[in-house]
Amino acid sequence: MSNAITMGILWHLIGAASAACFYAPFKKVRHWSWETMWSVGGVVSWLILPWVVSALLLPDFWAYYRSFSAATLLPVFLFGAMWGIGNINYGLTMRYLGMSMGIGIAIGITLIVGTLMTPLLNGKFGVLVGTAGGRMTLLGVFVALVGVAIVTRAGQLKERQMGIKAEEFNLKKGLVLAVLCGVFSAGMSFAMDAAKPMHEAAAALGVDPLYVALPSYVVIMGGGALINLGFCFIRLAKVKNLSIKADFSLAKPLLISNVLLSALGGLMWYLQFFFYAWGHARIPAQYDYISWMLHMSFYVLCGGIVGLLLREWKTAGRRPVSVLSLGCVVIIVAANIVGLGMATN
């Protein structure tokens, strides 16, 4: 396995670790509605950071974006909005199915859809099946899906042992939302593929290969921001017991703490895709679809490890922890299979 591929996998792991940890600061926010907290973090992660980073990278910020036609930018924006819809559905999926089943189904579907639809739509799937390296990477995708399923089973055992139930369990509604969440969340993978002309233009301007995807985030995350912030603002305006005015009328020390914690959560959220861009840059072009598989499977892996480190599994018993450990090992094996496949001609 080449150093470039190894580093690509490592950067995806670091990005996924940030994704697994980003909600920790949000949990410390007090006396704010979820909508206000999510909006403040979202403004940082979807608007401020993509714009600031792009302004630092590009020699002429406005000229870069003006150089693209609407036919190039619109699909990138719409796929970003598609991913934003998946974000909203994610929370509802957890509500009706519970954390473990919801995450397992949603992540499993988005892993498959986001990974395999791109080569299918681009007419490259036959090439992948017809080469030794392609077949090995596809095997790695399947093994990763098995790993996600095992971790999901561990979560179910944990919830059963600890008496944790879904807020409003509804299997039919939850499954529909999980499928929608999985499909729409794959919009980020599609957006990255649609943004290739933007990446190439950034490279032509002399932007380092590690950073060429970052300017496209202004458009991708702009689409996601429209959906997420729109959802939050509508709820803040229409739901009687929600009030952004009340949330910002707290005592100054608590208000500052809430803003900083939400901003930190937003920063950590952004970093997952900052390092995703680095990892994506190191993956061979013919296997760029694998970036999404690595990100999502590592997200599940890191989520399990973080849960163990935070002692969330302390009272779950030995069997759930053993099953979780097995699932994590399977995901690590999947990453190695994919890495070997990418290194095979």
Curated annotation (Swiss-Prot):
Cell wall biogenesis/degradation found in the keyword field: no
Molecular function GO terms recorded: rhamnose transmembrane transporter activity; symporter activity
Pfam families cross-referenced by the UniProt entry: RhaT
Mode of membrane association: Multi-pass membrane protein
Cellular component per GO, a single term: plasma membrane
Localisation: Cell inner membrane
Protein function: Uptake of L-rhamnose across the cytoplasmic membrane with the concomitant transport of protons into the cell (symport system).
Family of this protein: Belongs to the L-rhamnose transporter (TC 2.A.7.6) family.
Protein's name in the database: L-rhamnose-proton symporter
